[in-house]
């Protein structure tokens, strides 16, 4: 049913401006205070008047901050000692944090402020105590090295724990206070430190490998030059007067010719590599393509209730062979030579050309480790003059090692080419995904329901957004809105907003991250509701539920909703209908994690753990594959991954738990890890342009309009779900609802105070109608619920002319 979405209440502009001005004023005040205190501390002179002593030279102050600065410095040194120098730095750190979040709305929290203040107190006490224990104070300063606080705490701790125990205690308190005061995550510090260490190690290792390679090449060149000199001296020797010397020279030449002929015979006996046939165009299109080529009999019926034709996509270009068997064999022989230069004996077993890359399957000699070949990937790329070389260590069912080398002329894999295949047409799942072609040019078709969730990551320009569009269009070409529904979350407000208005959407494209959290909460509540329905029906998954509902409808005995709560004996439970598969697409997962934070991670983990049987699936995409975004909790529950080109091996390991994604070519080149395996498949993603997406969206708009559910973005709890919806902060008064007056008018005219009646009349959700009835009860319009579940209308009816 069609529902209207009320406009969210916005914060008044004057309040926003006031918050920003107050925040700017606080920044200026704190910055000036930090500079003033540091200037006072650095120019402290004991001859100046202060709090701890008097001075006969009161008229002249040496401190650059003046009389007040001298007093402030004396107080800080007297109380904190050397730690007084750190105190302005702590204020500066907090000022910097406020500056970083200056564009966010100001939200005061007394509990959070108290927690930060406790952290500052721990910092000051622990720092002063450590200064007193480990430093000696100068005679030109008042008090001790740790001030009064440090002296008292340090002496007490030394008597109880000795110096070592006291140091350990105060260091722990100092780190705890620093974490609480500045929100510093030590796990993130360790991750960054480890990443820098690994990058430096790889840098030094690469430099060492280059040096050893250059050294070996120089040695080989010197040896070759010496051999040439020896040949010249042997062959072009001066005429010897002795006949015996001439005979020996002839024998040496004959021996060299015999050895050369033997070497040529061995090369001729070498078995050439088997070159696999090139990927040709599909032998025959799918039945759907042939059916769409037939002209429809009635123009009006060609749109209503049908899927968009694949012909609205750009057709695939005619494939032409851009190589020859001789060139492939030459590259294979060159590969053997280059690996032999690095001390690795191999032989090319087979060659598999593809649209983007060519895989050379090599057979290593006995005793050669695969790791030696993997470590030579960059050196091979340099030797072969290509952008990157990827080494496939394990090929299932074979004893060979794969070396993937990019082609000189790269072919474009069109999206229409993948959709026209029988593999896509014969797939029965409503959430079938057409990814692209594998290295051999065969289509890669997968089922999102079997994944059941997908994690996509890749840097900017790697083809990640095009891949997400291809997945969405795969669903739009496969199923109608009665079979699949979409919830799209687009923090960047650019990628997914193009799909606004298609009938598959359950709610408008979400760009506000607070609404994104509400959408995920609704998904969890819907998951719980579906599980309760399936438990009542005695089925185990969504397909079994839909089958049972369909059989009941075909038999003329539709099933009633067993979870419906009746308010009176006159209420009738609504009939069960087919439940569609729901796909939640998040384009930039990192932005949502940064803004909403931990609660989104928990919601996603809960959906990923349980939502498979309920027919709710996630597609999470991010261009920042770091461990603070793709956490262990998310990775553990989403085993299916898709890695586009990334910048480092660490990012590749974060996504697919192994290297390789950093050696991809970009522009849709990906490593796809199917469910149930740890061996990624290299896939060349299908290209879909923005114009094609627009054409598909317009075609679906002609076939229907969206049926939005207002409860999704309102963050409302579903009845009987057992899950706290956690709506927006503070909540809203139901009387401010845009439809509240219309609901009161309906109740007064019909004299029926029923939630279900209001729900059917206004075409809204159950929870919204219940809130309106409760608001009428608070306002005295209707009575509270009687024993039989009914209510009486107290207010008089409207006056009629």
From Swiss-Prot:
Keyword Electron transport attributed: no
Topological category with respect to the lipid bilayer: Multi-pass membrane protein
Domain of life: Bacteria
GO molecular function annotation: ATP binding; DNA binding
InterPro entries: FtsK/SpoIIIE/SftA, FtsK_4TM, FtsK_alpha, FtsK_dom, Ftsk_gamma, P-loop_NTPase, WH-like_DNA-bd_sf, WH_DNA-bd_sf
Keyword flag Membrane: yes
Compartments where located: Cell inner membrane
Ranges for domain FtsK: 441-653
Keywords: ATP-binding, Cell cycle, Cell division, Cell inner membrane, Cell membrane, Chromosome partition, DNA-binding, Membrane, Nucleotide-binding, Transmembrane, Transmembrane helix
SMART domains with a match to the protein in the record: Ftsk_gamma (SM00843)
Coiled-coil parts of chain: none
The protein's role, per its UniProt record: Essential cell division protein that coordinates cell division and chromosome segregation. The N-terminus is involved in assembly of the cell-division machinery. The C-terminus functions as a DNA motor that moves dsDNA in an ATP-dependent manner towards the dif recombination site, which is located within the replication terminus region. Translocation stops specifically at Xer-dif sites, where FtsK interacts with the Xer recombinase, allowing activation of chromosome unlinking by recombination. FtsK orienting polar sequences (KOPS) guide the direction of DNA translocation.
Protein name as annotated: DNA translocase FtsK
Organism: Pseudomonas syringae pv. tomato (strain ATCC BAA-871 / DC3000)
């Amino acid at each position: 049913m069609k529902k209207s979405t009320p406009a969210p209440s916005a914060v008044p502009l004057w309040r926003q401006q006031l918050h920003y001005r107050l925040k700017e004023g606080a920044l200026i005040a704190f910055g000036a205070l930090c500079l003033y205190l540091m200037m006072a501390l650095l120019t402290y002179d004991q001859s100046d008047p202060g709090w701890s002593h008097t001075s006969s030279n009161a008229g002249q102050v040496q401190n650059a901050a003046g009389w007040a600065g001298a007093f402030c410095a004396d107080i800080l040194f007297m109380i904190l000692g050397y730690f007084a120098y750190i105190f302005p730095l702590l204020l500066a750190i907090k000022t910097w944090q406020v500056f970083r979040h200056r564009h966010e709305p100001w939200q005061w929290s007394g509990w959070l402020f108290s927690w930060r203040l406790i952290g500052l107190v721990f910092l000051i006490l622990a720092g002063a105590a450590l200064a007193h224990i480990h430093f000696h104070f100068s005679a030109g300063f008042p008090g001790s090295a740790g001030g009064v606080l440090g002296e008292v705490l340090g002496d007490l701790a030394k008597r109880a724990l000795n110096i070592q125990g006291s140091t350990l205690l105060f260091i722990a308190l100092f780190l705890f206070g620093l974490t609480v005061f500045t929100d510093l995550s030590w796990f993130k510090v360790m991750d960054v430190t480890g990443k820098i260490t690994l990058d430096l190690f790889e840098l030094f290792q690469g430099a060492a490998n280059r040096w050893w390679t250059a050294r070996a090449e120089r040695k080989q060149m010197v040896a070759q030059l010496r051999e040439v000199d020896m040949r010249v001296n042997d062959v072009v020797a001066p005429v010897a007067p002795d006949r015996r010397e001439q005979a020996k020279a002839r024998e040496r030449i004959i021996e060299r010719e015999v050895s050369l002929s033997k070497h040529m015979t061995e090369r001729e006996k070498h078995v050439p590599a088997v070159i696999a046939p090139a990927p040709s165009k599909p032998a025959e299109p799918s039945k759907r393509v042939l059916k769409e080529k037939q002209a429809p009999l009635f123009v009006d019926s060609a749109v209503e209730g049908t899927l968009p034709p694949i012909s609205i996509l750009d057709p695939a270009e005619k494939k032409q062979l851009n190589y020859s068997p001789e060139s492939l064999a030459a590259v294979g022989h060159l590969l053997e030579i280059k690996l032999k230069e690095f001390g690795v004996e191999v032989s090319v077993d087979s060659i598999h050309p593809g649209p983007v890359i060519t895989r050379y399957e090599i057979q290593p000699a006995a005793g050669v480790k695969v790791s030696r070949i993997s470590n030579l990937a960059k050196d091979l790329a340099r030797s072969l003059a290509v952008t990157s070389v990827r080494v496939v260590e394990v090929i299932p069912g074979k004893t060979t090692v794969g070396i993937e080398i990019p082609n000189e002329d790269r072919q474009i894999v069109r999206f229409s080419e993948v959709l026209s295949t029988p593999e896509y047409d014969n797939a029965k799942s409503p959430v079938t995904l057409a990814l692209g072609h594998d290295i051999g040019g065969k289509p890669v078709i997968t089922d999102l329901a079997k994944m059941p969730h997908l994690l996509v990551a890749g840097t900017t320009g790697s083809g990640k957004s095009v891949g997400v569009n291809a997945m969405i269009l795969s669903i739009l070409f496969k199923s109608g809105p009665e079979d699949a529904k979409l919830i799209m979350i687009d923090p960047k407000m650019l990628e997914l907003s193009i799909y606004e208005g298609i009938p598959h959407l359950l709610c408008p494209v979400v760009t506000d991250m607070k609404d994104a959290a509400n959408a995920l909460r609704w998904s969890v509540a819907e998951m719980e509701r579906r599980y309760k329905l399936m438990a009542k029906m005695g089925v185990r998954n969504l397909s079994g539920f839909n089958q049972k509902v369909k059989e009941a409808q075909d038999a003329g005995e539709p099933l009633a909703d067993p979870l419906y709560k009746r308010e009176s004996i006159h209420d009738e439970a609504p009939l069960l209908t087919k439940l569609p598969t729901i796909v939640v697409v998040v384009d930039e997962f990192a932005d949502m994690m940064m803004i909403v934070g931990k609660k989104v991670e928990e919601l996603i983990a809960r959906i990923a753990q349980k939502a498979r049987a309920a027919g709710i699936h996630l597609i999470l995409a991010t261009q920042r594959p770091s461990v603070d975004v793709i956490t262990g909790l998310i990775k553990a529950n989403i085993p299916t991954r898709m890695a586009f080109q990334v910048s480092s091996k660490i990012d590749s390991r974060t996504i697919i738990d192994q290297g390789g994604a950093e050696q991809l070519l970009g522009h849709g080149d990906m490593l796809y890890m199917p469910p149930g395996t740890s061996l990624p498949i290299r896939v060349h993603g299908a290209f879909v342009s923005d114009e094609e997406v627009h054409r598909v969206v317009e075609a679906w708009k002609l076939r229907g309009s969206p049926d939005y559910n207002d409860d999704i973005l309102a963050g409302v709890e579903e009845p009987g779900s057992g899950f706290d919806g956690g709506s927006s902060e503070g909540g809203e008064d139901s009387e401010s609802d845009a439809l509240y007056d219309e609901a009161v008018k309906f109740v007064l005219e019909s004299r029926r105070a029923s939630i279900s009646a209001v729900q059917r009349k206004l075409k809204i959700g159950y929870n919204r109608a219940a809130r309106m009835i409760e608001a009428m009860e608070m306002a005295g319009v209707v009575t509270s619920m009687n024993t039989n579940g009914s209510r009486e209308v107290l207010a008089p009816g409207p006056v009629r002319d």
